[in-house]
Amino acid sequence: FSFFRNTWSKESTIITLHNLYLQTIGTLWKAQTECYRKLQDRPDRSNEAKMVKDAMPVVIIEGICRPHCSHAAANLEKMSRLAMYDLDHLNERTSAVKALFRALPYVAYTQTSISDRGLKVVVFLDARTPEEYPLAYAICQQTLERIAGHPCDEQCARITQPCSCVWDADAYYNPTPEPYPWREELDTDPSLTNLIKDKRNLPGSNGTPYATSNGSSSPFPPATEACGYIETFARNFTHYHPWQKGNRHESMLAMGRSARRKG
């Protein structure tokens, strides 16, 4: 799968899950991880904490992105058959839930989040196309949430959602995971397709598929060079400059200045 030096980069290399594990348990990202954890609870230094996190390398667990392109979903050109789940705010339950997931045959990897309060979990999902990925992801998510007794972050259901690298000496790696049996579960209970329909009907979601060049449909828009960059830019801008009622013009001017600095 793809490895980017930070969330803004359009230059990626290919890394294996085993290599990610070795770098995670080593000291490569230890200093940045400890720095973020010291800053995250200080309101006067929240911007510094955000900058430390944004500067961390990220991986796109779901596969390989096109060369010299962002990690936007439309730039995914080869599937890894893996999927990443994020359980935030586990807090004191983090270690216990990590132990639960280590016992599951389809879990390939776990790491503690950079916040030290949640988990990133990689599952051998065996989804072979972007079109079948959302349903496979949702079926497995339901199982993980039941086992953990805790919800997964819905934002990470988006294919190619970047996963921040981190230092975790207690990370877990399973070199021979079994595929999660989502196809068998779907055959047994066809109503599981409603998991996707329900998500598409949420406020702000768009359930309309996009046409592809071969006449089929896809849940992802056509590839553009800018889409991943723009999404990341907007998310980071609103973090540093929260929207305030009555300040529309000032916010637009600030966004324009920030965009010019980014080139």
Indicate residue ranges for each PLM-predicted region.
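DNA replication initiation on ssDNA origins
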Residues: F1-R81, K197-N201, S205-N206, E225
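Hydrophobic residues at beta-strand termini and immediately following loops
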Residues: Y85, T110, C165
